[in-house]
Amino acid sequence: MRGMGNMNNMMKQMQKMQKDMAKAQEELKDLTVTGTAGGEMVSVVADGHKNIIDVIIKEEVVDPDDVEMIQDLVLAATNDALKKVDELVSSKMGKFTQGMNMPGMF
């Protein structure tokens, strides 16, 4: 029955890891990153769950005759913010899958 002790220990470790992962995911919602474009003329703030929570456009970049430029800057800043969220999630959650060969996981 020696193997049962190892199995119980493994189950406890898995439960702890699951609890730690849930806590880390919960913490992500409180973390924010800021993506920028155009020399910080446009900033987009996102939380760790990829929700865009703020868009800041500096007044001097607003040109009614060039709306397309603002759209491009907002798009670039949003993509920058989402890339930073991916990096944040990877650094926070990657430790849970470290050493496991699980493609597509963090």
UniProtKB/Swiss-Prot annotation:
One of its GO terms (molecular function) is DNA binding. Residues 1-23 are annotated as: Disordered. Residues 1-16 have a biased composition (Low complexity). InterPro entries: YbaB-like_sf (IPR036894), YbaB/EbfC (IPR004401). Coiled coil: none annotated. It is found in: Cytoplasm, Nucleoid. Signal peptide: none annotated. GO terms for cellular component: bacterial nucleoid; cytosol. Keywords: Cytoplasm, DNA-binding. Belongs to the YbaB/EbfC family. Binds to DNA and alters its conformation. May be involved in regulation of gene expression, nucleoid organization and DNA protection. Homodimer. This is Nucleoid-associated protein Exig_0019. It comes from Exiguobacterium sibiricum (strain DSM 17290 / CCUG 55495 / CIP 109462 / JCM 13490 / 255-15). The lineage of its organism: Bacteria, Bacillati, Bacillota, Bacilli, Bacillales.
